């Protein structure tokens, strides 16, 4: 018979306190700190990684830290496998080389990675535990809608860009590559798939991928590359999903301004698809070589009345073409002139050469004066940039640099 063990009242209270603390203290997930030694290995092995690029002296970074940690705890309970979701951070003061590698221009910046590949769109939503957790849940959800009957194809939303994969089976290398691409580009296209007997009528030459452009009249396009080659498949689908001329909205304006490229914008009424098609064709014909130097965009005249007012235009004047350099706005001539070969290209070249800026301040260049006509130095005050107001706000971020005047 064992002797009874009696605890004094203070000892009993202490033991109960320790027990309660042990039971009710939540397990806090350690946020992974990234450096030059471990960053590639950790990100490459993570299905999804959300990385906080911060600086300790930044007050917005300080405010985000506890929120980021709590969101990590919430997600860790739902995705316990260490490689399913990783919450990580980079001290940009300590690791400026990493900050430069990922072009960090503001603190805090939250970037998403998939299997080591950085996604183009960073997280710009609300900085709350719920919002961050919901964002990760969305990223972990299946981006591909399975088709159970080919008749469903006839009811697709043709205002979207649709990518449809037809596969013999889901457990295949072909589908795994398709799924990987869909995870990256699901914000730009709607992805669908069909398998087995359902997809058989569309697999007469084997597994294949079809692109259905917006609109009912545009013909389908068939992918002819190797289905198991990720790079080739990704590049083909990206080319279809991310158009040369993108629409700017209030939702993506911050993202587009942060790319740092001036805007060539067509303002048009939403229902005026003819002007948009003309603009798209001329951009592709005249300016494809300028893709890395300027963003080609179109905007709804009704939604963007304020920028139009900056250039003394109203929706009644649309379609209107303009350049916003983030310092000034410059208006193209008559929209019909876009069909003159080289006219739109010269407009963009005049921006890069400084001619647009120079002529706004000092009048036409002497070379533009007609023979026998006396040159006049007519200075003007160019309208200020309107779209720079969509750039990251100093009330949400610590901004590291100002835009240079173009």
UniProtKB/Swiss-Prot annotation:
Disulfide bonds: 189-241, 301-318
Domain of life: Eukaryota
Region Interaction with ITPR1: start-end pairs: 236-285
A Pfam family it matches: Thioredoxin_6
Sample GO molecular function, one term: protein disulfide isomerase activity
Database matches in InterPro entries: ERP44, ERp44_PDI_b, Thioredoxin-like_sf, Thioredoxin_domain
Any one Gene Ontology cellular component term annotated for this protein: endoplasmic reticulum lumen
Signal sequence, start to end: 1-29
Annotated region described as Disordered, given as residue ranges: 360-387
Induction section of the entry: Up-regulated by inducers of the unfolded protein response (UPR), including tunicamycin and dithiothreitol.
Subunit structure: Forms mixed disulfides with both ERO1A and ERO1B and cargo folding intermediates; the interactions with ERO1A and ERO1B result in their retention in the endoplasmic reticulum. Directly interacts with ITPR1 in a pH-, redox state- and calcium-dependent manner, but not with ITPR2 or ITPR3. The strength of this interaction inversely correlates with calcium concentration.
Function: Mediates thiol-dependent retention in the early secretory pathway, forming mixed disulfides with substrate proteins through its conserved CRFS motif. Inhibits the calcium channel activity of ITPR1. May have a role in the control of oxidative protein folding in the endoplasmic reticulum. Required to retain ERO1A and ERO1B in the endoplasmic reticulum.
Protein name: Endoplasmic reticulum resident protein 44
Species annotation: Homo sapiens (Human)
Lineage summary: Eukaryota, Metazoa, Chordata, Craniata, Vertebrata
């Amino acid at each position: 018979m064992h002797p009874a063990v009696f605890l004094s009242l203070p000892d009993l209270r202490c033991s109960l306190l320790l027990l309660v603390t042990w039971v009710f203290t939540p397990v806090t997930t350690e946020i992974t700190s990234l450096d030059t030694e471990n960053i590639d290995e950790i990100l490459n092995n993570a299905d999804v990684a959300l990385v906080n690029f911060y600086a300790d002296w930044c007050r917005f970074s300080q405010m985000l830290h506890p929120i980021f940690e709590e969101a990590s705890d919430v997600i860790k309970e739902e995705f316990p496998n260490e490689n399913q979701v990783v919450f990580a951070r980079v001290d940009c003061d300590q690791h400026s080389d990493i900050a430069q590698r990922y072009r960090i221009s503001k603190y805090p910046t939250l970037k998403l990675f998939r299997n080591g590949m950085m996604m183009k769109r960073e997280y710009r939503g609300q900085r709350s535990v719920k919002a961050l957790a919901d964002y990760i849940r969305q990223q972990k959800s299946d981006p591909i809608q399975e088709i159970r009957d080919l008749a469903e194809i006839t009811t697709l939303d043709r205002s979207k860009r649709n990518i449809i994969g037809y596969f013999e089976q889901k457990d295949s290398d072909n589908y795994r590559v398709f799924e990987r691409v869909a995870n990256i580009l699901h914000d730009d296209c709607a992805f669908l798939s069909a398998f087995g007997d359902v997809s058989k009528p569309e697999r007469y030459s084997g597994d294949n991928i079809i692109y259905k452009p917006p609109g009912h009249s545009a013909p389908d396009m068939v992918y002819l590359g190797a289905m198991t080659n990720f790079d080739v498949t990704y590049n083909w689908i990206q080319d279809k999903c991310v158009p040369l001329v993108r629409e700017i909205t209030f939702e993506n304006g911050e993202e587009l301004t942060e790319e740092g490229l001036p805007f060539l914008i067509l303002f048009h009424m939403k229902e005026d698809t003819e002007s948009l098609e003309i603009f798209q064709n001329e951009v592709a014909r005249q300016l494809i070589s300028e893709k890395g130097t300027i963003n080609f965009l179109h905007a709804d005249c009704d939604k963007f009345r304020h920028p139009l007012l900056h250039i003394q235009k109203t929706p009644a004047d649309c379609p209107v073409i303009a350049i916003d350099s983030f310092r000034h706005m410059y208006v193209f001539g008559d929209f019909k002139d876009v069909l003159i070969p080289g006219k739109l290209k010269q407009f963009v070249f005049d921006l890069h050469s400084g001619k647009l800026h120079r002529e706004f301040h000092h009048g036409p260049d002497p070379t533009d004066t007609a023979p026998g006509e006396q040159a006049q130095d007519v200075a003007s005050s160019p309208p200020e940039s309107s779209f720079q107001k969509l750039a990251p706000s100093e009330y949400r971020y610590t901004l590291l640099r100002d835009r240079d005047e173009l």
